[in-house]
Amino acid sequence: MKNRFRLNLFRFVLLLSVCVSCSQEYDKALEDALNLAGENRPELEKVLRHYHGDTLKLEAAKFLIRNMPGHYSFADTMEVKPYYDEVDSVLTTMKGCNVWTIRDSLVKIDNKYADLSPEWVEDIQIIKADFLIQNIDSAFVQWKKRAWARHLDFEQFCEYLLPYKAEELQPLDAWRTYLREFHPDHLDELRYCDQLKNSSLQSAITLNDNLWYYMRPELTEASQVRPIYRLSTRLRMPFGICADFTNMAISVFRSQGIPVALDFTPQWAFRSLGHTWNVVLVNNGKNVPFSGATSNPGQPHKPDERMAKVFRITYAVNPDLKRLSEIEAFVPRAFRYPFFKDVTEEYMDCEDVEIEVGDSLDGRYAYLTVFDNTEWKPVDFALIKGSKVVFRKVGMNSVYLPVCYEAGGQMKAIGHPFLHTYDKEVRPFIPDTSRRVTLKLLRKYPVLRHVQGVVMRLDSGEFHASNDARFREYEMLYRVTDCSVTGREVVLPDTLGAFRYWRYYQPKNGSYCNIADIRFYERATGKQCVGKIIGTDGCWEGNPGHTKDKAFDGDLLTFFDAPVSSEAWTGMDFGKPVDIGRFVFTGRGDGNSIDIGDWYELLYWKEGGWHSAGKRKAETVHLLYEDMPRGALYWLRDLSKGKEERIFSYEDGKQVWW
């Protein structure tokens, strides 16, 4: 009994010491924040005194104050007010106008304020007690008395409802109050359904439907004007990038007491750019993705997009990110903001990746990067211990390059690029100069979803030759059965003979004879033959200008779009019979097939950098690179035009995109 008593006493003392230690650490974090407040410290102490008798609200206040350093606002909101007011004026006078006409007017205003650069200041130095108290009280009402957040525990409440703003530089105003009156259509009706009255999922769907109906937003890939942080103005903007609408949605949803956060991937693993979206914390404890004002919770949200990492924006500081900034001389921009956490495993199967980097980097930070079409972009970081670095929860079936950064910001590879396979293996790309291969390259970029649909209009198309202008009799030269989004070269037999009229004919319904490029070459000289363009007149009314001549203008981004769904055609009358030895054609697509006349350069990764395998001009619809090392990672660049380019490997005679 004595031994058991001593053991229990020891456990109690140990637990007490841990609690005291944690309390002291929390108090230290709070005191550090109060010290950073400077002359604004009395405002924050007033908040703490106000909640002295309410333990839970006091903890909420401490949470906000502890994590406030690093959150920023404009030092003087009056500096940006004239800009916001002019935007409001345009949105009022141009209500009902075409969204792109509105955009052009707003771009002019943006140019007028090109020199606007207001100073930033940390919230801890300017926030007022009354504002913070009102925010805390309002958030608690939404948590405890509204219908859609009662399932949250205190920690969840602190992140999903409590924060006094949704993003940096958002004005410190009474947004909860004025947004609460914004189109709460049908939300109150949920109280009449016992199944749905407490459903955060259904409330989010209902409110998001209202947002879409009110805003009808047009998504753009790039910002058209400087960010607008005043919510009353932002709610009226008819266009923007995904981050504009997701950040706005957080404030609108939280004003109604619906627990919503923002998730993002800093860089797609398979193409350029990154993406942001929302999540709602539903009653079963799961986060359900959606996109504010554009797609609802429960609808598939980019399910086939390959991601390397996913993070969630938080109000609380991430100690790992804070430590990173304290240790490293240079931190890439993606990781300078310390308010997000890793949630990759909520979205995909992922595994840790261990890499040997050598002893000389012990104690440094390494980064995992993915390719964004032009350069490697960091998506994760980890501390190097000894000669190894372990990256946690990494997405699979994607190519990565481990790097570190020099003090001046120069990126340096610390290993080979590698594929993280579905089998959870790390497969490095190492050029094998003892084993060589000839590369036949057909494209510089993978075929994405929006391209696949239109290229199928090439299916069943036919090439004919005839000496009859009406093609009552003709030779069938070629029938399209493979709808790959590449150019095709067709070599004709010597026995074919000469014909005056040559055409592409599309019998299939729904094809509209879509074709981007056709070129005929004389057998004897090998030169391109040009004649009078003949075929179906006109074009589809929804695509003016896309007449039959577009198939012969040498531009892969223009195409013939016939006025009839089937049995249209386009071709050439050479004025006399011509012996054509070959022809090439490219279907409607994205312009990323090999384009005759363009200059290209093939690069491959070797010894920490890209090495050139040579530049050449495309003479046909493919490029041949002979005597190339096997097992390398390649990158084909179009030096003449375009931006879309992608890394690939070469396997079984084909380009495999990463």
Language-model-detected regions and their locations in the chain:
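Structured interaction patches on ligand/partner-binding surfaces of diverse proteins
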Residues: 407-434, 520, 646-658
